[in-house]
């Protein structure tokens, strides 16, 4: 467990405060988890963003009438801190009985508070339900590898030694799996996700990739660090010209988390998947 997470509200009984309380936000420094992967803020081998989508955003108009909306938050992958997820939820709930004179004021408030917690500018987009309905459900790019026949015997920790490639071939492809699962390092609750790998490099053996993804099944770590670990393991193996790893996790408490790490300019489709 990250030492800072021990002091967060995650896994503890919490009072739900319904009036604006920005002090509820609990930042967790990324540095300790980067260090586990041999990284520092100055040596990150990727660009990236963590997309958080909130489906339970509500506030009051000055008249007292409630408003509901969906919010998208984009937290830079090189921000000094992540925001602990339960504290994020408690903070958003604190808007429920607070009056704002419009969505623009809500957006500005969210940007100010979340940027202060993350230590870097956080993008905020507030959307109405009709926009989301019109977008529909996204389909991940590339080939789904979930029907491949594999034998699995260990689930306790990621096993990069399972990964195989043919370095006599250089190819460009996208593959994805819906079998990503890990556990919250604080509560041990399951985190269910889908993951996309897009790259140009040595030809990756798809069955070995699937076995590797499944090896995360009982691993305890935050969403962001799971994706960073996958990125680094594939980068070491493939030595790719370009590489993107993008995971979309099932929501919990009205929030889903979607980390994106890439060697390329960010080009992210943040539409929800069928399980989101």
Swiss-Prot record:
The answer to keyword tRNA-binding applying to this record is no
The residues forming a coiled coil are none
Which residues does the record give as NADPH binding sites? 85-86, 252-253
Reaction(s) catalysed (UniProt annotation): 7-aminomethyl-7-carbaguanine + 2 NADP(+) = 7-cyano-7-deazaguanine + 2 NADPH + 3 H(+)
- The EC category is oxidoreductase
Please tell me the species this chain comes from: Pseudomonas syringae pv. tomato (strain ATCC BAA-871 / DC3000)
Record's protein name = NADPH-dependent 7-cyano-7-deazaguanine reductase
Describe the protein's quaternary organization and the partners it interacts with. Answer: Homodimer.
**Its biological function?**
Catalyzes the NADPH-dependent reduction of 7-cyano-7-deazaguanine (preQ0) to 7-aminomethyl-7-deazaguanine (preQ1).
Q: What keywords appear on the UniProt entry?
A: Cytoplasm, NADP, Oxidoreductase, Queuosine biosynthesis
Q: Where in the cell is it found?
A: Cytoplasm
């Amino acid at each position: 467990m990250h030492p800072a997470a021990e002091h967060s509200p995650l896994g503890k009984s919490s009072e739900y405060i319904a009036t604006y309380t920005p002090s509820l936000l609990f930042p967790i420094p990324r540095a300790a988890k980067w260090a586990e992967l041999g990284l520092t803020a100055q040596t990150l081998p990727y660009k990236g963003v963590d997309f958080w989508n909130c489906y339970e955003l509500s506030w009051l108009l000055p008249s007292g009438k409630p408003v509901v909306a969906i919010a998208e938050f984009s937290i830079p992958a090189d921000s000094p801190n992540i925001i602990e997820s339960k504290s994020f939820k408690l903070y958003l709930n604190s808007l429920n009985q607070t009056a704002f004179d419009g969505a623009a004021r809500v957006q500005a408030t969210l940007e100010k508070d979340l940027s202060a917690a993350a230590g870097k500018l956080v993008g905020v987009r507030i959307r109405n339900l009709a926009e989301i309905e019109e977008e529909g459900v996204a389909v991940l790019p590339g080939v789904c590898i979930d029907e491949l026949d594999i034998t699995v015997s260990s689930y306790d920790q990621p096993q990069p030694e399972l990964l195989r490639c043919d370095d006599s071939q250089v190819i460009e492809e996208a593959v994805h799996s819906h079998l990503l699962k890990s556990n919250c390092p604080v509560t041990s609750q399951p985190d269910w996700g889908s993951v996309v790998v897009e790259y140009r490099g040595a030809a990756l053996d798809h069955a070995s990739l699937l076995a590797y993804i499944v090896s995360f099944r009982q691993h305890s770590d935050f969403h962001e660090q799971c994706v960073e670990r996958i990125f680094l393991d594939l980068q070491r193996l493939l030595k790719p010209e370009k590489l993107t790893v993008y995971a979309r996790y099932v929501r919990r408490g009205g929030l889903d988390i979607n980390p994106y790490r890439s060697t390329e300019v960010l080009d992210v489709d943040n539409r929800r998947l069928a399980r989101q």
